[in-house]
C-alpha cells in the first residue's frame, strides 16, 4: 500500500512540475507582470497595505505587504515587506525570453525588489493578519492560541527583540480555540470580528481601550453555528451587518443591533460541504460570495437567500479564499487546495461558447493563475494597481502578478495559437 501511495505521489509531483514548466513558458503571453519570490518561511496570510509611493524618475512604485511566518520550531514573526512593482512601461515583453533558461529576463526574477521592513515577534504562526482600514499601522492577528493579538507597528522596532518575547499592544479575549476568520469594520473604527474553531464569532471594540493591562474582553459572542466557524466578514456598506460561514455548511447573516447573539437574522444551507470563506461585493450592497469544500463558489443576493444566484465551478479541490476585486463590480477571485487561483467575471455568465472553449471552463472563468506548485494559503488584490494580485503558497512562494490586458479587455490576442503550449497537453 505504502509503495502505491509513494508511486502516486511521485506521479503527481511529476505532473505538477510539468504543468509548471508549461506555465512558465507561456507567461509572456498570459501576463503583463509576474514576480516570484521565495520567502524565508511560508506565509499563511497576505494583504496589501493601502499606501503607495511613486519615486520620481523611477520605473517602479513602492507598495507594502502584511505577511506572517509559519516556521517549523523557530521564532515566528508578523512581517511588513516593501515591494517594488514596475510601472506599466517597464514590464517584461516576450522578447526577453531566455530559451536556454526557460525564463524571462526583466521581471521574472526579483532580487532586491522585495525587502522586509518590519519584523515583530509573534506567538506561534500567524494564521491571519489584517490591518485596520481607519489606521493601517494597526494590525490584528490570529494565533495558534485562542487570543487575537493587535499590534501598532509604529510602536515596535523594525528588528525584533532577539529574546523572542512577543508583546502585542492589545490582547483580545473571548475565544476558547484558534481560528482563521478576521474582519475589521470599514465603517466603525476599531470594531473587529473573529471566527473560531470553538463554533463562535467574537466582536471587540478596541477604541474603548483595555480595562486593565492590555486585555480587551469581547463586547459580544455570537453562538449560532454548530461547528467550526471558518470565516467572518463585515458588510462593507452597512455598519451593523456581518456574515459568517462554518463547517455546518451554513451561511449566517447577523445584525449587531439585534437583541440576541444566539440566532442570526438569516441562516441558509449554502453548500453541500464545509463553507470556508465569504466576501461581500464592495459595489453592490446585496451581493456576496461564499467558497466551499464542495469545490464551488456560490453567489448570493441578501434580498432572497433561499435562492443561490449562481455556482462557479472549475476548481478541483477545496476553496479556502474568495475575494471581490476592489476595482470591478463583476470580478471576483478564488483559490485553495488545487494550487490554482481562478478569476471570475459575472458579466460573462451564460455567454455562448464554442465546444473547444467549454472544455477549458465556463464562460465566466476569465483566468486561471497556474504559477503555484503547492496549496495557495491566501491572496490579496492590490488596491492601487488594478488587476495586480499577490498570492502566497505553502511552499514559501509569493507571487505578484497581473494578467495580460487583452484578457480582461476582450481584445483578441495577437499571438498565433501555434506559439502557445497547451497547459493540459
From Swiss-Prot:
Gene3D superfamilies: YVTN repeat-like/Quinoprotein amine dehydrogenase
Keywords on record: Chaperone, Chromatin regulator, DNA replication, Nucleus, Repeat, Repressor, Transcription, Transcription regulation, WD repeat
Compartment list: Nucleus
Segments annotated as WD repeats: 47-122, 128-173, 181-217, 228-269, 275-312, 318-369, 376-403
Cited SMART domains: WD40 (SM00320)
Entry's family note: Belongs to the WD repeat RBAP46/RBAP48/MSI1 family.
Record's function text: Core histone-binding subunit that may target chromatin remodeling factors, histone acetyltransferases and histone deacetylases to their histone substrates in a manner that is regulated by nucleosomal DNA. Component of several complexes which regulate chromatin metabolism.
PANTHER family linked: WD40 REPEAT FAMILY
UniProt-recorded name of the protein: Histone-binding protein RBBP7
Organism, as annotated: Xenopus laevis
